[in-house]
């Protein structure tokens, strides 16, 4: 068993050229059989493909990969993480709409960290023209060092400033998800819970990012449970050895589910119990930002499928 685990953590990362089907099959055998699965049910994860995983590869080369990772929608990332959001500006909405239709893909999300939470009116309008119920993910603004009652008051102030963006989300039928992020107002367990409690719009909630939380699978699952319907988006990404400094590729990939030490089982079982309807995005940050996580499109897709097999094993019937 120990040899099998070592093989899973090393040899798979070197076989970048194998097919996604082969990697998925190998992943299912990589030492996870001892972990408890969720009770069988009808729930299946609704995966969304992050364009940033492919760096600066063009959208035309990425869209065929959506179905290969068991997804139907794509999350467009702008610079510095990807270049696919900019393709709407350079190629035009009509061409991007045609590309999406050609591959049977829907626009499921747009990463809006650069725009911030208060400048989303145009992006919501764009999203409504290209898709339906599109999730815009961004960060919070406010005193990230506040605690206790001061933190709760800071979240209330943030929500007051957020009212125009909330109204736009409601008017356009979009979803606004605020990610818990280090050095952000929404970064601690308390801030996540209070934000979820204080939000009143059904179209606003949290993009849960385990990467920026203590690496405790039970804690992450508890936060998902406590958020309930305010949980709008899940990043399937762990901290691993971090994502700020250049690391050997094997260490960089420890952010991926099934590679690093974080147990995603509690979270996946909780999502199944909740019948979570939102997107789940298998994700990691390369260093430097904007490069593909691996050298080729097939290798990237295979790596995503490796993590997908690991996550799916927890909810397999």
Each language-model region and where it sits:
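C-terminal segment of N-terminal export signals and the immediately downstream linker at the start
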Residues: 31-56, 64-65
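N-terminal secretory signal peptides
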Residues: 1-12
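Active-site beta-loop-alpha junctions enriched in small/polar residues
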Residues: 50-54, 77-79, 112-115, 140-142, ...
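Acidic/histidine-rich catalytic cores of soluble enzymes
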Residues: 73, 167-261, 265-268
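Hydrophobic faces of well-ordered beta-strands that scaffold small-molecule active sites
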Residues: 45-51, 74-76, 107-111, 135-137, ...
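Active-site acidic/histidine proton-transfer and metal-coordination neighborhood
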Residues: 21-29, 61-63, 99, 103-206, ...
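Catalytic domains of carbohydrate-active enzymes, especially glycoside hydrolases
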Residues: 62-79, 130-131
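Glycine-rich, proline-tolerant flexible connector loops at the mouths of alpha/beta enzymes
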Residues: 76-95, 145
């Amino acid at each position: 068993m120990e040899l099998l685990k070592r093989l899973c953590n090393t040899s798979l990362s070197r076989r970048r050229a194998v097919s996604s089907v082969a990697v998925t099959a190998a992943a299912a055998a990589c030492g996870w059989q001892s972990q408890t699965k969720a009770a069988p049910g009808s729930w299946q994860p609704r995966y969304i493909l992050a364009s940033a995983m492919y760096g600066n590869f063009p959208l035309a080369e990425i869209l065929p990969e959506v179905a290969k990772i068991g997804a139907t929608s794509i999350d467009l990332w702008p610079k510095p993480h990807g270049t696919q959001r900019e393709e709407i500006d350079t190629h035009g909405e009509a061409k991007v709409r045609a590309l999406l239709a050609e591959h049977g893909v829907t626009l499921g999300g747009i990463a809006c960290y650069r725009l911030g939470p208060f400048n989303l009116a145009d992006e919501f309008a764009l999203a409504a023209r290209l898709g339906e119920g599109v999730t815009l993910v961004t960060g919070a603004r406010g005193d990230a060092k506040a605690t206790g009652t001061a933190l709760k008051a800071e979240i209330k102030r943030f929500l007051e400033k957020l009212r125009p963006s909330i109204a736009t989300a409601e008017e356009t039928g979009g979803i606004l998800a605020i990610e818990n992020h280090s050095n952000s107002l929404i970064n601690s367990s308390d801030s996540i819970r209070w934000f979820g409690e204080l939000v009143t719009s059904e179209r606003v909630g949290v993009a849960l990012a385990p990467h920026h939380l203590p690496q405790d699978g039970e804690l992450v699952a508890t936060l998902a449970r406590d958020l309930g319907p305010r949980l709008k988006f899940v990043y399937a990404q762990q901290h691993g050895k971090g994502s700020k400094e250049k690391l050997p590729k094997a260490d960089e990939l420890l952010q991926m589910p099934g590679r690093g030490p974080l147990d995603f089982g509690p979270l996946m079982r909780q999502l199944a119990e909740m019948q979570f309807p939102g997107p789940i995005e298998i994700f990691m940050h390369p260093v430097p930002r904007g490069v593909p996580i691996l050298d080729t499109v097939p290798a990237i897709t295979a790596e995503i499928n490796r993590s997908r097999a690991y996550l799916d094993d927890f909810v397999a019937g």
